[in-house]
Regions:
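Transmembrane signal-anchor helices characteristic of membrane glycosylation enzymes that use polyprenol
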Residues: 7-36, 214-227
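Transmembrane-helix signature of polytopic, membrane-embedded enzymes
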Residues: 9-17, 102-125
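Extracytosolic helix-loop segments that constitute the early lumenal/periplasmic catalytic or substrate-binding loops
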Residues: 20-22, 39-61, 68-71, 75, ...
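Transmembrane-lumen/periplasm boundary regions of multi-pass, lipid-linked membrane glycan transferases
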Residues: 42, 174, 178, 183-274
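Transmembrane-helix motifs of polytopic, lipid-linked glycan transferases
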Residues: 89-110, 148
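Short acidic/glycine- and proline-prone juxtamembrane loop motifs at membrane-interface regions
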Residues: 128-141
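Membrane-interface alpha helices of multi-pass inner-membrane proteins
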Residues: 131, 164-179
Length: 274
């Protein structure tokens, strides 16, 4: 083993196998209340009615989270039957995409394959990621697409490959289709931080960025169409503007006492054991 390496190749393989067992075994745990079971029932309704353009929460039209999480869960139920295992499969696959993208991103940033493996292990071992694979909501799907998009953006800035520009736009579109504009904000801040560090502004702001914009615009057409079919122009306004504004202004949320240490104590458990 190289003295600069924290883990041997054997240890890395064994740890990845161990985490794979943890995540796969989590497929068979009964769904938690409230959101996981609720989202599963909403996806099940799509499957049974063969209707992927309308989302209902009980008997009421659901104008909140975008369609991607429900689409993936419903398609999985179509393929594997209606069960909590089928509901969790897309989340598990998206987290696998997130772990792989984390590895590849770390390799680009540090020019070191070993660091990439360590980064993927840190990602897989974080308590919040393990929880998102078991208590499945939109988080697992969103996380996988966001990390994939950031990896492709950084790869595009480094290499100027057209394929990375297309994948960066599509990855951002998938993240948007999972959570709305907040996903774009997260990706944007990450890329801005990288550009401030690398100073590669000209490699980002050039004509090829139009390819990113076009692939993003094409990628969000399905979710915009679904919102328009169910809610008309109100649905388009909601996903493009109102949803994010409501979250930033806390409109529609119950008023509670502010917890100024919320992110501090949340991060303490979310990234255990690191």
């Amino acid at each position: 083993m190289n003295q600069n390496q924290l883990l041997t190749s054997r240890q890395i393989i064994m740890l990845h196998i161990g985490f794979s067992i943890v995540y796969i075994s989590g497929l068979f745990i009964p769904l938690m209340e409230n959101d996981s079971a609720q989202h599963a029932s909403m996806a099940m309704r799509m499957t049974l009615n063969n209707d992927f353009l309308h989302i209902f929460k009980g008997e009421n039209p659901y104008l909140d989270k975008p369609h991607m999480h429900f689409w993936l869960a419903a398609l999985s139920m179509k393929m594997f039957g209606i069960s909590h295992v089928a509901y969790r499969i897309p989340a598990l696959l998206c987290l696998a995409l997130g772990a792989f993208s984390t590895k590849k991103l770390a390799e680009i940033l540090y020019d070191n394959e070993h660091t990439g493996y360590l980064a993927s292990l840190i990602f897989l071992s974080a308590q919040t990621i393990i929880l998102s694979a078991h208590d499945v909501r939109t988080d697992a799907v969103l996380t996988g697409f966001i990390i994939f998009s950031i990896w492709q953006f950084v790869r595009f800035i480094k290499t100027q490959h057209i394929s990375s520009a297309i994948l960066a736009g599509l990855g951002t579109a998938l993240a948007f289709s999972s959570k709305g504009l907040m996903a774009i904000v997260i990706i944007g801040f990450c890329i801005l931080a990288y550009l401030l560090y690398s100073r590669d502004w000209k490699k980002f702001f050039n004509l090829k960025i139009i390819i990113v914009a076009l692939s993003f615009a094409i990628g969000i057409i399905p979710v915009l169409y679904a919102y328009h079919v169910q809610f008309g122009d109100e649905g388009i306004r909601f996903i493009l503007f109102n949803q994010s504004v409501n979250r930033l202004t806390a409109s529609g949320f119950e008023e509670t006492s502010p917890d100024y240490f919320f992110f501090f104590h949340t991060l303490l458990w979310a990234f255990l054991p690191f």
